[in-house]
Design a protein with these regions (language model features):
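Generic structural signal of hydrophobic/aromatic residues within well-ordered alpha-helices
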Residues: 16-20, 24, 70, 112, ...
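Alpha-helix boundary/N-cap detector
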Residues: 7, 11, 15, 83, ...
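Low-complexity intrinsically disordered segments
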Residues: 92, 96-135
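N-terminal domain-onset segments
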Residues: 1-44, 128-135
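Short, solvent-exposed aromatic-acidic interface loops
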Residues: 67-80
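Amphipathic, interaction-prone secondary-structure segments
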Residues: 28-67
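Low-complexity, intrinsically disordered terminal/linker segments enriched in charged
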Residues: 77-99
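Hydrophobic transmembrane signal anchors and adjacent membrane-proximal interface regions, especially
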Residues: 3, 58, 73-75, 90, ...
Length: 135
């Protein structure tokens, strides 16, 4: 399996790609056009907080995939009105970036993406806070 990361608008690291491949490989259907990977911390809630859920969608064929998007979710609202919303959304195919304030060209995320990725990898690989599901 190969995930294209060179030449992207954002500085996706080899460490990120290698970890993603390692998580996907045991579960991936050989001819799958889409691979969706969900990362969830079971205790995350609107009331108590925790580690944001993350969804990564890959698209491709013949074992070669592109990152379609990486979305980090958070709760917005209070009490029964709280709902999961996109906190950060890196849309590689569409070339857009979304945060809680609006939509922007993806290049706007050049500074925040490395910080997000480093934090995410720490939570996932070093602290093991996520349950990972490959669809």
């Amino acid at each position: 399996m190969r995930i294209q990361y060179e030449g992207l608008a954002l500085p996706v690291t080899k460490r990120f790609i290698d970890a993603l491949i390692k998580a996907i490989e045991p579960h991936r259907e050989p001819l799958a056009e889409f691979v969706c990977v969900n990362f969830r911390e079971p205790k995350y809630s609107a009331e108590d907080g925790g580690y944001h859920p993350v969804e990564i969608l890959l698209t491709g064929t013949s074992g070669r995939y592109d990152i379609c998007y990486i979305t980090d979710f958070c709760y917005a609202g209070i009490g029964d009105c709280a709902e999961l919303v996109k906190s950060l959304d890196f849309e590689f195919i569409a070339g857009t970036f979304q945060d809680m304030t609006g939509y922007y060209p993806i290049e706007v995320a050049r500074e925040i993406y490395p910080i997000w990725e480093d934090n995410f990898l720490t939570y996932w690989l070093d602290m093991a806070v996520f349950e990972v599901e490959v669809i």
